[in-house]
Amino acid sequence: KHFDNMARATSLKTLEIAMRMDDIEDLPFPVGTVLTRDEIEELHRYNLHDVIATIYFYVRCIPEIEFREVLTKRYDRNFMNHNDTKIGKDYLIMKLEESGVKCFIKTPTGRIPRQTLRPSIKLGDVIFPYVKLEHPEFRRIHETLAAKTITETKGSIKDLTCIVDGLSYKFGTGGLHASDDCKIFKADDEYAIEMRDVTSYYPSMAIVNNLRPLHLGDQFPLIYGDMFKQRRSYPKGTPENAMLKLALNGTYGDSNNIYSPFYDPFFCMQITLNGQLLLCMLVEQLIKTPNLRMININTDGVGFIYPRKYRSHVDAVCGWWEKLTLLGLETEEYSLFAQRDCNNYIGVEV
C-alpha cells in the first residue's frame, strides 16, 4: 500500500486473491501472440477486469491514504510514503526532540542516531526483582535465563522450552507462545472459554516500570507515558489514536534496530523477557483452578477453558496479577475456539 513495503513487487493476481475477488484471470493468450479481432475483444475484457481490480485495491487503501494526508497536513511533514512503523517512530522522535531530547548527532556527512551499545548483557540484571515463579518448569526457565550472559539479542534464547500440564511453552525474543494445536473447543452451560489479554502490553510495561533506552534519559518515560494517556483520550478510528498507537508500539521493535535512535538491547530484553515471565506467573496461578485448561498463549495474553462456577476465582487471580504488575487485563469470551496453532485460529465471540 506504500512503496516502502517488502511486498511492493506483489502481482495484481496475488492482490486479487488476497482481496477475495470472485473472478481471478490470467492473460488469455501467450505473450507475443498476433491477435484476431475476436481475441482483441477478449483482451479488452481482460484488461478491464484488471483495471477494476486496481480500482478495488485503491478503494481498500483509501483509509490509509487519508490517514497519511491528515498527518502530513497537521505536522507539516510528508508522511505519504511512510510505512506504519516509520510513522510511529518519526512522531515519537518529533515529540522527544520538541522536549529537548536529542535523538541524533549531527556530523559533517549528515546525522547519526544516538544509541546505547552493549558489549554484553547479563540477563539476571534484566529480570524484574518481583518476578517469582513456583512451578518447577517455569522456575527452571527463570534460572536458566538469569544465569545467561549474551553478546547479541538475535537467537539469544532460541529453543528454550518447557512443558507444563502437557502444554509446550516456547520462549524467545519474539515472545511466549503455546497452544493446544489442531483442536476445537466449545463453550456450554458448564464451561467457558476466555482470552485474557494485557492492555498494550509492551508499552504499558515500559511505562509502569520506568524503562527507557539509556541514552534517551529520564524524559523518555515521561513523554512515552504522556502519549499513552493522550491516546486513550482519542476515540478509536481517529488519526490521533492511530498515530499514537503506532508510536507506542513501534518503540519496542526499534529498540533492537541497529539503525534506530531507540537502539538499546538491554531495554529490548527488559521488555521481552519480563513480558514472558510475568505471563508465566499468571499461568501458574490460573492452572491451580480445578479443571482449567490452557489452550492458547501468544505474546500478550492467555486463553483457557474452565468451569464457569470458578469465574470469581479466575477473576481474583487476574486481579492479583494486575495489582502486582500494575498492568490491565481485557477479557474476551468465546462460544467456540478452533485453532491450528497459536497464530492461526478462529474464535466466535459471545
Question: What are the residue ranges of the model-derived segments?
Answer:
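Conserved "right-hand" nucleotidyltransferase catalytic core of DNA-directed polymerases
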Residues: 7-11, 15-26, 32-199, 285-322, ...
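Helical catalytic core of nucleic-acid polymerases
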Residues: 6-9, 27-34, 155-284, 288-289, ...
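Activity-critical C-terminal alpha-helical subdomain
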Residues: 1-5
